[in-house]
C-alpha cells in the first residue's frame, strides 16, 4: 500500500509517444522535486520571481491585464474567465477580499490537494499576485477540512513566506501589504460553492446565498466585494506573470487556454492526474494514450464516463474524441467542470453507479431549498430500494418526476427550482443513466437484481458518519 | 374594517381566523388602484398592467394586486431567505423567461411577471409535494389544522396525493423548547421563520438550525432553553403546527374561533391584536401588523396574560365589608353603601382621593375623572408614584415611528426590554438596521445596551451630570446635531426621584431644542388616563401626596380604580400607612389584590375583552378596544360604575345637564370624550374604528418643569440603590396567568461580582440591606451588568419587599449591605 | 467534558485576532476543541461562545452542519473509507465490508475499546488511488484487505504513532500571527462595521 505521500502527477514530460498534443508543465513542475513544497526548494526553482517582478515593475492593472489576456478559465467548475471576474469588482469599494477555494470535494476531482500539498508556495505567490492586482486587504485560504497534510504544508509555507517578507506588511519593501489567513472547513461538500464558502468563512452554516443579489464580486465576504478563485486557477498566476498572458493563451485552443490538470479515475489501467494542453487533448487521449491512462482495464471497453465531476451529465463512447474544450463539451451537453473524469467499463452496474452519485448529493445537500433537501433524499431512497430488490414499476416515473421538480425540463445547462446547482446535480446521473440504460433499471424492478454481466457491489445499509446530531 | 387576514391566504380572508402576519384592514381599505404616483413603476402581472412603488419585491407586488403567490418562508417583516422555494414565478427578462423566487426578486419598471403559467404551476406543485413528503399529515390532532398555510396551500396549489412511500423522518415530539413553546420537528418545514425571528427581530439567538440536509432541525443548545420575552411570536409566524404555545395547545379548533380586532392593554405600547375566543372564552391573542406600532409582534406577557381573564379568582360580584369580612352582595346594596360612604365624606372638603384609571379605557378614566370633578376631589392620580410627572407629556411628542427613524434615540429611563417590550423590538430594529444610533443613559446595563452606539453609565440620580458631560463630548455633540433626536423618557429607577429624569431631559432640551420626547410610562392606558383628567393638578395632590394625606388621617375615603398601591407604590411603607390610615377604601377591580383585601366596598370591574372603548398609547395614539366575550359574573365596565355611583351622591351627583347623564353606551362616552377633552376631537368613534393605526392626538398639558436636580453626596461605604421592573413580576395580570406566574424571577439584590466578593458573601447568601427608612433581608446575586457601588433589585417580586427601604421623599436611596445573621 | 485549556485559549484568541470579524474564527476554534478532547463537548461549545461573543446555540448550529465535528467521543482512530463513485468502481464497499468484519463493528460505530471508529465517507480527493481511506485524515491509497489488516495492527501496536496523531488533531503546524501581520483587513472591516 503506498504510504501517505501524494502521488506525483504522471505528467507527459517525455516526447509524444502516441501523437497526443503536448505542452510544458506550468504548475506541476515541482511535483517531482522532493523539497518543492519547502520555502528553500521553491525559491531555488525560481519561486517568488513573478511576485518580485510584479511588485517592483508592474502596476496592479498591468497584472490584471496579463490575466485578462491569458483568458484563463476558472478551474473550480464553472470555467468563468478569471480576468473578467476580477473586472466585476465595483470601483472604489473597500475593503475587498480574495478567497481561495481549496475545498476540493467534487467526486472524481483530485488536483487542488496536490497543488496545496506539493507546491503551497506557488499558490501563495498566486494569491499575493491576485491581491495586488485587485487591491485586496486580506486573503483567505480555505482548505478542505479533511486535508490535514495540505493544511500543514500551507501553514508552514505561510509562516515561511511571512518570515521572508513575501506576505504581510510592505511586501519585499514595497508599499503593498496584504495578509493571508489560513482557514479550513470541517466536512461539507457544499462549502465548495463560493457563497457557501463565504458563509463558512463567516463562521456560519455553509448554506449558499442567492445570486443575485449576493454575487461575491459585489457582496461577498462580510458583504464586501470579494473574488473567489480556485486553487488551480491561482496557481497558474506565477507562470503567467513570469511569461505572459499571451504565452498562456497561445498554449492551447482559443476557447480553452493554457494547460489544465485532469484527474482520470475509475476503470483505467493507470489512473492519474495529468497536466495537459487544454482544449486540444481529447478524452480518448487521456484514457488510451500510454503517457496517460493506457487504456481501459482488462482490455474492456468504455460503457460511460463522467467528463467533469459528479455533477456533470455522463458521456458515452461516442464522446471520447471530443477535445477537452469548454465550448465543445458544453455544446455536447455536459461540462468539463472540475477536471474530473471517471471511466466506467462495460462491467459497471449503471443503477448502482447512478445511486452512488445521487447518494452523494443527497448526503451533501445543505438543506436550505425544499426541492434539494427533500428531493435528493427521495431520489436516493427510490434507487436504493431498487438496488435492494424492492423496486416497483411506477418508481421510474416517480424518479423522473421528482427530478423534474428539482430541475424543470431536465435540460442542460440545468434549470433549477433551487438556490444553487447542487440539487440539480443529483438529477444529472439519473437523466444520464435512465435515458441510456433504462433496461438496467427495468431489470432491477422486474428481477430485483442487475442485468447479467455487471459487477455487483457489496453495498449495504450504511449508517454513514459516526455520532452526528 | 376587515378582520385580520393571513398573509398566506389573502384569497379567503373572511373565513380565516389566523392572525399570522396580519395586515389587517389595509387590503380592504384600498379598494381601487392607487393613482400612479410620480415615482411608481409599471409591472405587468399576469397580463395586467399594475403600478407599484419602487424598491419592493415581486411577491408583494403580486399579492397586493390579486395574483396570489403561495409562500412559506417569506415574511414581510423579516429579510427574505428564499428557502422554501414555494413562491416561484416566471419573470421575463433580457435573458429570456426565468423561474425565480418572487420573495427575493426586486421589482423593476416594465417587468413582466407570470404567476399562473403551466410551468409555474408545475414548479409550485412539485415543491408542495416535496414539502409534504416528510410531513406527518397529522392535521386532525394539530393545533394549526384549519388555519395552516401548508394545509391550505396543499389544497389550493398541491398535487392532490403523495407518492412518497419511503420512511418519513422521525424525531422525539413534541419537545418543550421553553416554558411557553413546544416544538414538533416532524411537522417543521424548515422555513427559517422562527430562527430568523429569534435572530433578526428579538436578538435572542437561542434557537438555530442544527445538523444538515435532510436532517436539518430547529433546536436549542442542549439544556439551554429558548428563553425569550418574545417567544410567542414564533408560534404565530410558524406556517405549520411545528411550534405551539402551551397556553393554547388543544384548547380549540380554529374554525370554532371568533375574533375581534383590539389593542393590547398590557403596557403603554398598545400593540394591535386580535382577540380570539371559543365558546365565549378568550383563548388566544395574535399580533396584528400595524405599521405604526407593533409590526405584528407582541411580548409574551401581553400575549399570554389572557389566562388572567379566565382565572377563577376573578371578582365576579360586589362585596361589602361586614363583621364576617368581605361579603358578596347585590350591585344596588354595594353601590348604595359606596355612595353612602362618599356622601358622608364629601361633607368635608378634600377628603376623598381617587387613584387609578390607567388599567381601563379612555372612557373608564374619563368617567372616573368626571366623578372626581363633581366630588371636588383634587387628590387623584393615574399613577402611584412609580411614573413621572404628567408634564412629561407636555414636551413636543414623538411617535414610535419617528423614534425608530430618528438619527439619534436618547434613552433616559427604563429598560425598555423589561417594561415596553415591543418598543424595545422597534428601537432595536432601528439600531440594527443602522437607521438610528442609540445614546443611552442608564445606571445599569439594559436590554438595549448591546445595540447602543454609546451607553453612558451614571450613578442613580446623576443623569443631569451625565448629560452635561456627554454634551461636551465632540462625537456625541456632532451626533446630536446630525439629525432628528428623540428622547425616550421614563422612570428607570423607583428608588430615585423622578425629578432626576426631568432635569436630565431639560438639560438635553437646552442643547437640542428641536428634540422630541416619547414618554415611556408603562401602564396600559396611563397616557389616556392622565389626559382624561386623572392627572393630579399639582405635586400637592398626586398619588404620593394622596397616600400621605391618607396616612395622616386627612382622607376619609380612598377610591382605588384598578390601582393597588400596596404592590405598585415604590414607597411600600407609605402605601401601608395610607391604607391603614384612611377610614374607608372603595376598590374597583377585576381581581383580588392586596388593596382589595382592605376594602370596605369592592365593585367588580369587567376586564379587557369584556368591554369596548378606546385606549391611548405612549405616542398619544388612540385605538379601539373591543369586547369579545361576556363579562365575568355581574362585573361592569369602570365607566359604568363611575356613572352608577355618580347618580347616587345626592347633591354631589352628576348634574342633570352633565354630558355623562345621557350616556347609554360606551360609544356615547367616546363621543363625549372627543367633544370635550382638549385634543381628542380627532379621536371620535368613527375615526378610531376605521384604522388599524388609530389616531394620534396631541397632549394639552404643560411641560414639566425641573428646578434642576442633583443627588446628595454619597458615602463610600454605601451602595446606591436601583429598583426597576422586570417583564414578569408579581403583578395581578401575570400572577393570575398560569403559564406566566412562574416566569417572574423572584426578589434578589444584584451586585457587581467584585462587590459580592468585597462584601465577603457568596452568591445566594442573605444580606441585610439598611436604608434610612428600614432594613430588609434579601438574597444576593452577582451580575456584571451592575456597575460597582450600585445595588439593583427587581421591583414587585415574590420573596423580597425592596419597597420597604425606599423613601419616596428622598432623592436617591443609599443602603448599607451586610452579611445577614 | 471540558472547556478549552489555557493554551488553547491563547491559540484561539490568536486566530480570532486575525479575523475581521470574530465569528470567522468559529470553525478553526471548534477544531481546537476537537483536538483537545477528540470531540466537541458541550462545555467547549459554551466556552467558545464566550470567547467569540455569540450564543452557544449559534456555535452548535454551525458546528453541527459539518460532518467532521463529533459531539460524543469517537475512537482514537477514525477510519474513513471512501465509497464514492471512483472508489466504489474499484471495490470500496468490499473493503468497507472487510473493515467491518475485521473490527467487529458497523460503519458509523466505535469498537468497545475506544480504539477505532469506521465511517463510510464521500469523496476524499484521492480518486486516482482508489480504493482510498483516511485514518484521522491521513491517507492510505489502493488499500487491499491485507493492507487494512496491517494498518489496524500497526495502529494498535503504536507503529504509526509518529505519523498519525489521535483523532481531533489535524495540521500539526499552525499558522501563527507574525510581527509583520499587516492587519489592514481587520481594521478596514471594523471601520465599515462600526456603527
Ligand atoms: C455545489 C458546488 C460545489 C463546488 N465545489 C467547488 C470546489 O470544491 N472547489 C472549487 O474550486 N470550486 C467549487 N465550486 C465552484 C465555486 O462555486 C466557484 O465557482 C469557484 O470556486 C470559482 O473559482 P474559479 O473561478 O477559479 O473556478 C463548486 C460549485 C458548486 C455549485
Ligand atoms: S440546492 Fe441544495 S445545496 Fe444548494 S442551496 Fe439549495 S439545498 Fe443547499
Ligand atoms: S417564500 Fe420565497 S422561497 Fe419561501
Indicate residue ranges for each PLM-predicted region.
Chain A
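Cofactor-/ligand-binding subdomain signature composed of acidic, glycine-rich
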Residues: 11-64
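Conserved phosphate/anionic-ligand binding catalytic regions in large, soluble enzymes, centered on
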Residues: 68-89, 185-199, 203-205, 362-375, ...
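Short acidic, glycine/serine/threonine-rich loops at helix termini
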Residues: 78-79, 83-86, 109-112, 151-156, ...
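Histidine-anchored nucleotide/phosphate-binding helix
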Residues: 119-133
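Short amphipathic, charge-patterned alpha-helical segments
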Residues: 126-130, 279-297
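Hydrophobic alpha-helical positions that pack around
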Residues: 151-278
Amino acid at each position: 500500500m503506498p504510504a501517505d505521500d501524494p502521488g506525483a502527477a504522471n505528467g507527459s514530460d517525455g516526447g509524444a509517444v502516441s501523437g497526443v498534443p503536448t505542452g510544458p508543465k506550468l504548475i506541476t513542475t515541482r511535483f517531482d522535486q522532493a523539497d518543492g513544497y519547502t520555502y528553500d526548494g521553491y525559491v531555488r526553482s525560481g519561486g517568488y520571481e513573478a511576485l518580485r517582478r510584479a511588485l517592483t515593475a508592474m502596476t496592479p492593472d498591468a497584472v490584471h491585464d496579463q490575466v485578462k489576456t491569458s483568458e484563463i478559465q476558472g478551474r473550480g467548475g464553472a470555467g468563468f474567465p478569471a480576468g473578467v471576474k476580477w473586472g466585476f469588482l465595483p470601483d472604489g469599494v473597500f475593503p475587498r477580499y480574495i478567497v481561495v477555494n481549496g475545498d476540493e470535494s467534487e467526486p472524481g476531482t483530485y488536483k487542488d490537494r496536490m497543488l496545496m500539498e506539493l507546491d503551497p508556495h506557488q499558490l501563495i505567490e498566486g494569491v499575493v499576485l491576485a491581491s495586488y492586482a485587485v487591491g485586496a486587504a486580506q486573503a483567505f485560504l480555505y482548505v478542505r477540512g479533511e486535508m490535514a497534510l495540505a493544511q500543514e504544508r500551507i501553514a508552514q509555507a505561510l509562516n515561511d513566506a511571512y518570515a521572508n517578507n513575501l506576505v504581510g506588511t510592505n511586501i519585499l519593501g514595497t508599499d503593498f501589504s496584504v495578509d493571508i489567513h489560513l482557514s479550513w472547513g470541517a466536512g461539507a461538500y457544499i462549502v465548495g460553492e463560493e457563497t457557501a464558502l463565504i458563509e463558512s468563512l463567516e463562521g456560519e452554516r455553509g448554506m449558499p446565498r442567492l445570486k443575485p443579489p449576493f454575487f461575491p464580486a459585489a457582496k461577498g465576504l462580510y458583504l464586501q466585494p470579494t473574488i473567489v478563485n480556485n486553487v488551480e486557477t491561482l496557481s497558474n498566476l506565477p507562470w503567467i506573470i513570469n511569461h505572459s498572458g499571451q504565452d498562456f493563451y497561445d498554449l492551447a485552443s482559443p476557447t480553452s487556454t493554457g494547460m489544465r490538470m485532469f484527474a482520470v479515475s475509475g476503470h483505467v489501467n493507470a489512473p492519474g492526474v495529468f497536466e495537459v494542453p487544454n482544449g486540444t487533448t481529447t478524452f480518448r487521449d487521456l484514457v488510451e494514450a500510454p503517457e496517460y491512462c493506457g487504456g481501459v482495464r482488462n482490455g474492456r471497453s468504455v460503457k460511460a464516463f463522467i467528463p467533469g465531476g459528479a455533477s456533470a451529465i455522463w458521456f458515452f463512447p461516442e464522446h471520447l474524441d471530443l477535445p477537452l474544450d469548454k465550448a465543445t463539451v458544453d455544446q455536447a451537453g455536459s461540462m468539463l467542470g472540475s477536471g474530473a473524469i471517471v471511466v466506467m467499463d462495460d462491467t459497471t452496474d449503471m443503477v448502482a453507479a447512478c445511486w452512488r452519485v445521487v447518494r452523494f448529493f443527497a448526503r451533501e445537500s445543505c438543506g436550505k431549498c425544499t426541492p434539494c433537501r427533500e428531493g435528493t433524499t427521495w431520489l436516493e431512497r427510490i434507487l436504493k430500494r431498487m438496488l435492494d430488490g424492492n423496486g416497483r414499476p411506477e418508481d421510474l416515473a416517480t424518479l423522473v418526476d421528482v427530478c423534474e421538480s428539482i430541475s424543470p425540463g431536465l435540460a442542460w445547462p440545468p434549470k433549477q427550482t433551487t438556490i444553487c446547482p447542487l440539487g440539480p446535480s443529483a438529477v444529472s446521473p439519473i437523466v444520464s443513466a435512465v435515458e441510456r440504460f433504462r433496461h438496467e433499471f427495468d431489470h432491477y424492478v422486474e428481477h430485483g437484481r442487475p442485468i447479467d454481466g455487471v459487477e455487483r457491489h457489496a453495498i449495504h445499509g450504511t449508517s454513514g458518519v459516526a455520532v452526528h446530531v | 374594517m376587515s378582520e385580520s387576514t393571513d398573509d398566506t391566504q389573502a384569497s379567503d380572508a373572511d373565513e380565516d381566523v389566523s392572525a399570522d402576519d396580519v395586515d389587517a384592514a389595509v387590503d380592504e381599505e384600498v379598494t381601487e388602484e392607487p393613482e400612479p404616483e410620480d415615482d411608481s413603476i409599471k409591472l405587468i402581472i399576469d397580463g395586467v398592467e399594475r403600478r407599484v412603488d419602487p424598491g419592493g419585491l415581486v411577491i408583494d407586488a403580486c399579492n397586493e394586486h390579486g395574483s396570489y403567490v403561495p409562500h412559506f418562508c417569506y415574511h414581510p417583516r423579516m429579510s427574505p431567505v428564499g428557502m422554501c422555494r414555494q413562491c416561484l414565478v416566471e419573470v421575463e427578462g433580457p435573458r429570456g423567461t426565468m423561474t425565480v423566487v418572487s420573495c427575493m426578486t426586486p421589482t423593476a419598471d416594465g417587468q413582466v411577471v407570470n404567476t399562473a403559467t403551466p410551468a409555474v404551476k408545475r414548479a409550485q406543485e412539485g415543491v408542495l409535494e416535496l414539502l409534504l413528503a416528510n410531513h406527518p399529515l397529522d392535521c386532525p390532532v394539530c393545533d394549526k389544522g384549519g388555519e395552516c398555510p401548508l394545509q391550505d396551500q396543499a389544497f389550493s396549489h398541491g398535487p392532490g396525493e403523495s407518492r412518497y412511500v419511503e420512511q418519513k423522518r422521525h424525531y422525539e415530539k413534541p419537545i418543550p423548547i421553553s416554558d411557553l413553546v413546544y416544538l414538533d420537528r416532524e411537522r417543521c418545514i424548515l422555513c427559517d421563520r422562527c430562527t430568523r425571528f429569534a435572530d433578526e427581530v428579538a436578538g435572542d439567538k437561542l434557537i438555530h438550525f442544527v445538523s444538515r440536509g435532510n436532517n436539518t432541525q430547529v433546536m436549542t443548545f442542549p439544556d439551554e432553553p429558548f428563553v425569550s420575552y418574545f417567544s410567542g411570536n414564533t408560534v404565530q409566524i410558524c406556517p405549520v403546527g411545528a411550534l405551539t404555545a402551551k397556553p393554547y395547545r388543544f384548547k380549540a379548533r380554529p374554525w370554532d374561533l371568533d375574533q375581534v380586532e383590539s389593542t393590547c392593554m398590557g403596557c403603554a405600547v398598545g400593540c394591535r391584536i386580535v382577540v380570539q375566543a371559543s365558546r365565549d372564552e378568550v383563548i388566544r391573542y395574535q399580533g396584528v401588523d400595524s405599521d405604526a406600532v407593533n409590526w405584528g409582534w407582541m411580548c409574551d406577557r401581553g400575549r399570554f396574560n389572557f389566562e388572567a381573564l379566565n382565572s377563577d379568582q376573578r371578582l365576579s360580584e360586589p362585596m361589602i365589608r361586614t363583621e364576617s369580612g368581605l361579603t358578596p352582595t347585590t350591585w344596588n346594596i354595594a353601590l348604595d353603601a359606596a355612595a353612602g360612604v362618599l356622601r358622608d365624606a364629601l361633607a368635608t372638603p378634600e377628603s376623598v382621593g381617587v387613584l387609578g384609571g390607567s388599567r381601563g379605557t379612555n372612557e373608564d378614566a374619563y368617567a372616573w375623572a368626571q366623578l372626581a370633578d363633581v366630588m371636588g376631589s383634587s387628590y387623584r392620580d393615574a399613577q402611584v408614584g412609580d411614573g413621572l410627572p404628567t408634564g412629561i407629556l407636555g414636551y413636543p411628542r414623538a411617535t414610535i415611528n419617528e423614534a425608530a427613524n430618528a438619527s439619534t434615540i436618547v434613552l433616559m429611563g427604563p429598560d425598555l426590554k423589561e417594561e415596553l417590550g415591543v418598543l424595545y423590538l422597534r428601537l432595536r430594529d432601528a439600531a440594527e438596521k443602522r437607521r438610528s444610533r442609540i445614546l443611552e443613559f442608564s445606571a445599569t446595563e439594559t436590554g438595549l445596551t448591546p445595540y447602543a452606539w454609546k451607553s453612558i453609565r451614571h450613578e442613580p440620580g446623576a443623569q443631569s451630570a451625565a448629560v452635561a458631560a456627554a454634551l461636551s463630548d465632540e462625537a456625541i455633540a456632532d451626533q446630536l446635531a446630525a439629525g432628528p433626536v428623540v428622547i425616550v423618557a421614563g422612570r428607570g429607577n423607583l428608588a430615585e426621584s423622578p425629578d432626576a429624569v426631568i432635569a436630565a431631559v431639560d438639560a438635553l432640551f437646552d442643547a437640542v431644542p428641536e428634540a422630541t420626547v416619547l414618554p415611556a410610562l408603562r401602564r396600559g392606558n396611563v397616557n389616556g388616563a392622565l389626559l382624561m383628567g386623572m392627572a393630579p393638578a399639582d405635586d400637592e395632590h398626586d398619588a404620593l401626596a394622596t397616600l400621605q394625606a391618607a396616612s395622616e388621617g386627612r382622607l376619609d375615603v380612598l377610591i382605588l380604580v384598578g390601582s393597588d398601591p400596596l404592590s405598585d407604590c415604590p414607597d411600600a411603607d407609605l402605601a401601608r400607612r395610607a391604607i391603614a390610615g384612611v377610614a374607608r377604601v372603595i376598590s374597583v377591580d377585576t381581581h383580588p389584590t392586596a388593596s382589595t383585601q382592605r376594602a370596605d366596598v369592592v365593585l367588580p370591574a369587567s376586564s379587557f375583552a369584556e368591554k369596548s372603548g378606546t385606549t391611548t398609547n405612549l405616542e398619544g395614539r388612540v385605538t379601539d378596544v373591543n369586547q369579545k366575550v361576556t363579562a365575568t359574573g355581574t362585573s361592569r365596565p369602570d365607566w359604568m360604575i363611575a356613572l352608577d355611583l355618580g347618580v347616587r351622591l345626592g347633591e354631589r351627583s352628576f348634574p342633570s345637564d352633565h354630558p355623562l347623564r345621557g350616556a347609554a353606551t360606551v360609544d356615547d362616552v367616546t363621543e363625549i370624550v372627543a367633544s370635550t377633552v382638549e385634543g381628542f376631537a380627532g379621536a371620535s368613534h368613527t375615526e378610531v374604528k376605521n384604522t388599524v393605526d388609530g389616531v394620534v392626538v396631541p397632549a394639552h398639558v404643560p411641560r414639566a418643569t425641573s428646578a434642576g436636580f442633583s443627588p446628595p453626596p454619597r458615602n463610600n461605604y454605601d451602595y446606591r440603590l436601583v429598583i426597576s421592573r422586570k417583564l414578569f413580576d408579581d403583578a395581578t395580570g401575570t400572577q393570575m396567568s398560569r403559564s406566566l406566574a412562574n416566569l417572574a424571577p423572584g426578589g434578589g439584590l444584584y451586585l457587581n461580582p467584585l462587590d459580592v466578593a468585597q462584601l465577603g458573601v457568596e452568591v445566594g447568601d442573605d444580606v441585610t440591606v439598611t436604608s434610612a427608612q428600614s432594613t430588609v433581608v434579601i438574597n444576593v446575586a452577582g451580575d456584571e451588568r451592575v456597575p460597582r457601588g450600585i445595588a439593583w433589585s427587581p421591583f414587585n417580586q415574590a420573596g423580597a419587599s425592596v419597597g420597604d427601604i425606599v423613601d419616596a421623599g428622598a432623592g436617591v436611596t443609599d443602603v448599607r449591605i451586610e452579611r445577614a445573621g | 467534558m471540558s472547556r478549552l485549556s489555557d493554551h488553547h485559549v491563547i491559540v484561539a484568541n490568536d486566530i480570532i485576532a486575525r479575523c475581521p470579524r470574530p465569528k470567522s474564527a468559529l470553525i478553526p476554534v471548534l477544531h481546537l476543541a476537537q483536538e483537545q478532547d477528540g470531540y466537541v463537548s458541550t462545555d467547549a461549545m459554551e466556552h467558545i461562545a464566550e470567547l467569540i461573543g455569540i450564543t452557544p446555540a449559534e456555535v452548535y448550529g454551525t458546528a453541527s452542519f459539518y460532518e467532521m465535528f463529533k459531539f460524543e467521543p469517537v475512537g482514537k482512530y477514525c477510519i474513513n473509507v471512501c465509497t464514492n463513485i471512483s472508489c466504489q468502481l474499484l471495490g470500496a464497499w468490499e473493503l468497507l465490508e472487510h473493515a467491518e468484519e475485521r473490527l467487529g463493528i458497523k460503519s458509523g460505530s466505535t469498537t468497545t475499546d475506544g480504539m477505532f471508529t469506521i465511517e463510510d465517507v464521500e469523496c476524499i480527493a484521492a480518486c486516482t488511488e482508489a480504493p482510498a481511506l483516511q485514518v484521522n485524515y491521513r491517507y492510505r491509497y489502493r488499500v487491499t484487505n491485507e493492507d487494512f489488516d496491517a494498518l489496524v495492527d500497526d495502529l494498535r501496536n503504536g507503529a504509526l504513532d509518529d505519523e498519525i496523531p489521535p483523532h481531533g488533531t489535524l495540521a500539526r503546524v499552525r499558522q501563527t500571527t507574525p510581527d509583520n501581520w499587516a492587519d489592514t483587513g481587520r481594521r478596514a472591516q471594523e471601520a465599515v462595521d462600526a456603527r
